[in-house]
A protein has these predicted regions:
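Non-heme Fe(II)-dependent double-stranded beta-helix
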Residues: 2-47, 54-162
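Double-stranded beta-helix
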Residues: 73, 77, 177-242, 259-264
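Secondary-structure boundary elements
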Residues: 125-133, 162-165, 173-181, 194
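Short acidic/polar capping segments at secondary-structure boundaries
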Residues: 139-147, 160, 174-179, 190-194
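A short hydrophobic beta-strand segment most commonly corresponding to one strand
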Residues: 170, 249-263
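Short beta-strand segments enriched in hydrophobic/aromatic residues
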Residues: 174, 237, 258-260
């Protein structure tokens, strides 16, 4: 019997992470050497709750995946008039409508990225085990905001943080996202670090998945990435997709995660 325990049924973010692992994240007590992360990166990961692994997949591989996503959505990267047509598949999670989610999961391009050695090794580092399962996640084409296609972005958890979930999530950049105005990953490491203190000032009936960030907006970090980079983050880190405020740049990404395999 699978030992993963479902912490909640309705989540405001990624549905593939609705289950928390029964195994804990790597604390390095076994002193196994890191495969990808440096000691400096490890310290950053522990403190901030996220880390960017540069060139996790080859840039050409990222570009090929991006090209596939454009074709799958029947949109033309050089023709803005095609960008705002309805997506091929309706979003079941209405709070993600307008964020550019692409409902594709099992194409070979996506599997090539999931099976890239450096991607796997990075997840081995954060979990401390070689026996991992990969999640089957969607992708993202986040277009510039325009009238009728607004999206404010929201900070959330995919778990109730009170349950202290053991899980990580991740995203591979399929296009350069060095312009922080063009959308992409944002998070609040301060809240990751100070959650227990922060919650003392919050009402008991607060939304457990979408924190009130009034007064702590200044702590939001907007993470820049280049095509081929992998970002892994702790599920206790509040995060979200920032709105694309650029004129004509598209944020393209693939969601990915791995978790310890469970024996039957």
């Amino acid at each position: 019997m699978n030992k993963y325990a479902s912490e909640h049924k309705e989540i405001p973010g990624n549905p593939s992470t609705a289950k928390s692992s029964s195994k804990k994240l790597n604390d390095r007590q076994n002193r196994s050497p890191l495969r990808v992360l440096t000691e400096k990166q490890w310290s950053f990961w522990v403190q901030k709750g996220y880390i960017v692994i540069k060139k996790a997949i080859p840039k050409k591989q990222a570009e090929a995946t991006a090209t596939f996503l454009w074709e799958f959505e029947e949109k033309n990267p050089k023709d803005v008039s095609t960008w705002y047509k309805p997506p091929r598949a309706e979003m079941q999670m209405k709070e993600l409508a307008g964020t550019g989610m692409v409902e594709v999961y099992n194409n070979q391009y996506l599997w090539d990225n999931r099976q890239t050695q450096k991607v796997y090794d990075a997840f081995v580092d954060v979990w401390g085990t070689e026996k991992l399962w990969v999640t089957i996640d969607r992708a993202n084409l986040n277009f510039p905001i325009k009238k009728g296609f607004e999206y404010k972005g929201f900070i959330h958890w995919d778990y109730d943080p009170e349950t202290k979930p053991q899980n990580v999530q991740g995203v591979i950049a399929l296009s350069d996202q060095t312009d922080i105005n063009m959308g992409g990953f944002q998070c609040i490491p301060w809240l990751f670090q100070n959650y227990d203190l922060w919650k003392l000032g919050q009402p008991e009936d607060r939304n457990r998945f979408q924190p009130d960030i009034s007064g702590i907006e200044k702590y939001i970090e907007k993470v820049a990435m280049e095509a081929g980079d992998l970002l892994i983050f702790n599920s206790l880190l509040p995060h979200g997709i920032r709105p694309n405020l650029s004129k004509d740049k598209v944020r393209i990404a693939q969601y990915i995660s791995m978790m310890p395999a469970e024996e039957d």
